[in-house]
């Protein structure tokens, strides 16, 4: 291929990304609407027709998804707690995260993956708890099975994760399937990676039956692990996310750097490098790090040097109430005293340029 054409193909992915309309998963706002399912379905802007139909047809599932938004956003904030961008959400913003996720960055890849995983987790859990009419426990886990410890009987309530994945795919992917641009393909890939991550941590739990706990008989079921497992796994995928470009026919990806491996279905992918998130920026949606607490003794991302972007920090002396002198009393209580602890809190200085306060 001659060099001018090669240059066009190198720039095409960026052009596709820049020309992509403002994309956001508006269903993320479902956690903030509250009220009945009809209120939720009619008041979340930006849902496509098939999403709104599913919303009206399955109000019990929508309640579970709405409650699940709090869980996966909290997990996102936990994973990013020591980073300049800390997965902060914006009140009264229908996109939940503002403009920051319009960039096809690693952060966007993570949020799309963990939100998709959050839907799988919330819907599957609601099924097992009998809160959804259209599903229940996994109907395939019946009869007997065999593992390394021998034969067992399927019993209890195995989490119906296949239903959760199927519903998440139909609902979450609906808006992206209508698009043919690069960002839609990126979102679909990361959505799928998120769904798959929940099933990865499905574990078998068993209960023993028999004389004196001999475990001559076992009843087993499949259960999802705590959502933190999924969050930790996707965090590792975020740190190993692969930068990609569109292939020449616009149907898939290829690695931006030939030295890196081709992404698998489990990997997160992104197009654009992230901003540094140091200062408040209306264009990128960054809220900056002014006022963020930093760790004076750390050498990691939460260190005052890194978190404050070299601007320095302020130190305040504060006291807080803690439990101390705890003692175990027979039987069966732990009694503690209330003590005041004095400590220094370090917070990042604001940029000297007054323009940093411009609203996002």
Curated annotation (Swiss-Prot):
Compartment annotation: Secreted, Extracellular space, Extracellular matrix; Secreted
PTM comment: Palmitoleoylation is required for efficient binding to frizzled receptors. Depalmitoleoylation leads to Wnt signaling pathway inhibition.
Cysteine pairings via disulfide bonds: 76-87, 127-135, 137-157, 206-220, 208-215, 278-309, 294-304, 308-348, 324-339, 326-336, 331-332
Superkingdom of the source species: Eukaryota
Signal peptide (residue range): 1-25
GO molecular function: cytokine activity; frizzled binding
O-palmitoleoyl serine: lipidated positions: 212
One GO BP: positive regulation of mesenchymal cell proliferation
Keywords: Developmental protein, Disulfide bond, Extracellular matrix, Glycoprotein, Lipoprotein, Secreted, Signal, Wnt signaling pathway
Glycan attachment points: 295
InterPro entries according to UniProt: Wnt (IPR005817), Wnt2 (IPR009140), Wnt_C (IPR043158), Wnt_CS (IPR018161)
GO cellular component, one term: cytoplasm
PANTHER family hit by this protein: PROTEIN WNT-2, WNT RELATED
Membership in a protein family: Belongs to the Wnt family.
Record's function text: Ligand for members of the frizzled family of seven transmembrane receptors. Functions in the canonical Wnt signaling pathway that results in activation of transcription factors of the TCF/LEF family. Functions as a upstream regulator of FGF10 expression. Plays an important role in embryonic lung development. May contribute to embryonic brain development by regulating the proliferation of dopaminergic precursors and neurons.
Protein name, UniProt field: Protein Wnt-2
